[in-house]
């Protein structure tokens, strides 16, 4: 339920979060939590790529780190808005709408990466989006998808209420409200003709009980729901005061109930 990059444009306003400078900080916190939980920036067995594409690059942090790992490669970050300042020399940012098709020819990219766009890409578009990712991938190259569930577990009262508000908002906007994207990542890849597909589920802790990862994830979700308060108010008639109280109660629940949030990582290889 945690929105990543590829934020809303004038044409596509389905992304649930409004634009705001603090979103840069939140997305970076999210990145650090995921990197630590996975133990790496990716799980696919990528070796010395010459061209890497990060779709929905957000702040660019993931791509910046790939630039450092593969200094001989060009890393391209695609998003509706520009990356943060300080990009490495081998980074190139492209502003484009994923839903209008990727602005690349067939078979160009060694490694295609896309993360946390289920709160930006309509459910009905997912199969076509993954097919387009496979199209631009070079034969023998790798595609990796990372997406989150639409629920927090256990769904304690305040936590469950916040998650339900998020799902209602997503449903209104044609986004995933049932976890179908989370559960279908490997199938999307297989149906796009990708082979050697693997899927890994990871349960991330929320709260200080979960150490550094839990602390980062709690900060991410606290910022997420705080940012969503005016959106909930406008779309669902929920007062800012109720949202504030729900967030406060939810933070207590995370520590008491050892709440977790699951992500799925699926990757595969484009056949030669």
Where are these regions (language model features)?
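N-terminal, positively charged/glycine-rich alpha-helical extensions of SAM-dependent methyltransferases
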Residues: 1-34
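Conserved alpha-helix/loop element of class I SAM-dependent methyltransferases that forms part
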Residues: 26-50, 61, 65
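Class I SAM-dependent methyltransferase SAM/SAH-binding core
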Residues: 51-101, 111
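A short glycine-rich, Lys/Arg-flanked "PGG" loop and its adjoining helix->strand segment in the class I
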Residues: 127-139
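C-terminal helical/coil "lid" or tail adjacent to the Rossmann-like core of SAM-dependent
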Residues: 14-16, 197-258
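Conserved catalytic/acceptor-binding region of the Class I
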Residues: 105, 138, 142-223, 233
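A short SAM/SAH-binding and catalytic strip from SAM-dependent methyltransferases
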Residues: 110-125
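Core SAM-dependent methyltransferase catalytic element
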Residues: 192-195, 263-272
């Amino acid at each position: 339920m945690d929105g990543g990059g590829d934020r809303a444009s004038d044409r596509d306003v389905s992304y649930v979060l409004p634009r705001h400078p603090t979103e840069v900080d939140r997305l970076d916190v999210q990145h650090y939590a995921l990197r630590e939980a996975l133990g790496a920036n990716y799980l696919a067995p990528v070796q010395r790529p010459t061209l890497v594409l990060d779709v929905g690059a957000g702040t660019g942090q993931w791509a910046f780190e790939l630039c450092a790992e593969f200094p001989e490669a060009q890393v391209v970050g695609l998003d509706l808005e520009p990356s943060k300042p300080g990009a490495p020399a081998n980074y190139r940012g492209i502003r484009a709408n994923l839903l209008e098709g990727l602005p690349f020819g067939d078979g160009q990219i060694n490694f295609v990466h896309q993360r946390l766009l289920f709160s930006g890409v309509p459910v009905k578009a997912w199969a076509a989006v993954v097919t387009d990712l496979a199209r631009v991938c070079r034969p023998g190259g790798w595609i990796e998808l990372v997406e989150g569930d639409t629920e927090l577990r256990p769904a304690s009262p305040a936590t469950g209420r916040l998650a339900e508000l998020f799902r209602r908002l997503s449903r209104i906007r044609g986004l995933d409200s049932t976890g179908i994207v989370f559960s279908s990542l490997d199938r999307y890849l297989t149906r796009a003709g990708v082979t050697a597909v693997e899927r890994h589920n990871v349960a991330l802790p929320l709260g200080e009980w979960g150490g550094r990862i839990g602390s980062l994830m709690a900060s991410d979700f606290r910022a997420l729901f705080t940012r969503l308060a005016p959106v909930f108010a406008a779309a669902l008639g929920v007062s800012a005061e109720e949202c504030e109280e729900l967030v406060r109660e939810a933070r207590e629940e995370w520590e008491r109930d050892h709440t977790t949030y699951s992500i799925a990582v699926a990757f595969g290889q484009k056949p030669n």
